[in-house]
Amino acid sequence: MKKEIELKFFVDDLDPVRRNLKKMKARFEGSFRESDYFFDTPQNTLKKRKAVLRLRIGDSRHFLTYKENIEKGRFKVSDEYETSFENPKVLLKIFERLGFRVWFHYAKSPREYWRCRNSLITLDSFPFGKFIEIEGGPRRIKFIARKLNLDFSR
């Protein structure tokens, strides 16, 4: 289990963020297509416990993630358990057979992964907007966000 701390920002344009990441000597780790499937029971057991069960299916890698104790304030903080797996179709079938249902699904056009100062920065583009997510310690997140000229009020 790890403690995940993250902050998301809405932006109008990803290009200035990319330029600033390069100026900061951030390391580009790649761009991957991903589809996220969120599961719960018909009784919304996980939602009631403030927990999330997510299957992330990517181009070349797949992850099963369980998050609980999700606190939403300035930073989103949660206990996160994550593991990789090989066969998404089988895992989807297992969840279905266990009585879980997909309550939300979305696909990300290539998600960009960057590393800087022991933090993970992801850039996402959806039909409804562009987002930056920074994961790390609160002070690091704030520092990186300022260097990227991200607006804390959005």
Regions found by a protein language model. Give the residues of each.
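N-terminal strand-loop-strand beta-hairpin
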Residues: 1-119, 150-154
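Short amphipathic alpha-helical "recognition" segments used for binding
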Residues: 10, 137-139
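Catalytic DNA-binding helix-loop module of base-excision-repair DNA glycosylases/AP lyases
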Residues: 130
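Mixed-charge, glycine-accented linear interaction segment located at domain edges/termini
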Residues: 139-154
